[in-house]
A protein has these predicted regions:
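Sec-dependent signal peptide recognition
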Residues: 1-8
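Short, intrinsically disordered, charge-biased short linear motifs at domain edges
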Residues: 2, 26-29, 93-97
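C-terminal motif of bacterial Sec signal peptides marking the signal peptidase cleavage site
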Residues: 11-14
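Bacterial signal peptide processing site
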Residues: 16-19
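Post-signal-peptide N-terminal segment of Sec-exported extracytoplasmic proteins
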Residues: 25-69
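Compact alpha-helical subdomains of small soluble proteins
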Residues: 54, 61-109
Length: 109
């Protein structure tokens, strides 16, 4: 029985503080009002910037997952957890969606 509790504890703690995969990070609820004053060219530039930033943050989050997996090996299952990358990715995904909605509502091509 003692070994069972130890195994359950180790299984539980091995899941402790793992970073969230980028595919599971959703976009924040961002109002499109900040993009309403932009013309189509400026909106397009902003969307391109946000897409590039999203890619950078997804790579950073994937690297954090790899580092966390390496750390778990020697730190009794304790990972690095989510950092600033995940919260910024959450915000950037929401901003990109808001900009895309405004872009489509203005019927930009």
């Amino acid at each position: 029985m003692k070994h069972l509790w130890l195994i359950l504890f180790l299984v539980f703690i091995s899941c402790y503080n793992n970073p969230t995969p980028p595919s599971e990070i959703t976009g924040a609820q961002i109002s499109g009002l900040q993009y309403e004053r932009f013309d189509c060219d400026t909106l397009n530039d902003e969307i391109i910037f946000l897409e590039n930033r999203e890619r950078e943050l997804m790579l950073a989050q994937e690297n954090r997952i790899k580092e966390s997996n390496r750390q778990q090996w020697w730190a009794n299952g304790m990972g690095k957890g989510d950092g600033i990358e995940s919260s910024e990715l959450h915000r950037v995904k929401g901003e990109k969606l808001a900009a895309l909605i405004v872009f489509q509502s203005k019927e930009c091509n």
